[in-house]
Regions:
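Basic/aromatic DNA-contact patch characteristic of tyrosine site-specific recombinases
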Residues: 1-91
Length: 91
């Protein structure tokens, strides 16, 4: 499986099979705004909330893609949508 070039609706089975780049990490953008899956050279994959607040870019680790504390793509989308709603209400 190749790295996606643009935003994709990330599915668990596809995400587990995203290739590891031994030289650098990369991010896969989900179709849900501000949700990214970060793939590290070690093979570790985790969800990231990537947003701009008051002109400053922020990245918040949500949790791992697999393992005992795994966060599913659906749960990651729910979390980001909730945070985005709260962030917009506070503006």
């Amino acid at each position: 499986m190749k790295k996606p070039k643009g935003p994709v609706n990330i599915k668990l089975q596809n995400a587990l099979n995203y290739p590891v780049d031994p030289d650098r990490d990369y991010r896969v953008a989900d179709t849900t705004k501000h949700l990214k899956l970060r793939v590290l050279p070690s093979g570790y994959k985790y969800w990231e909330y990537d947003y701009i607040w008051k002109g400053v870019r922020n990245k918040q680790e949500i949790g791992p893609l697999d393992g005992p504390n795994a966060i599913s793509p659906t749960k990651a989308r729910e979390l980001v949508n909730g945070w985005e709603h709260n962030r917009k209400v506070r503006k």
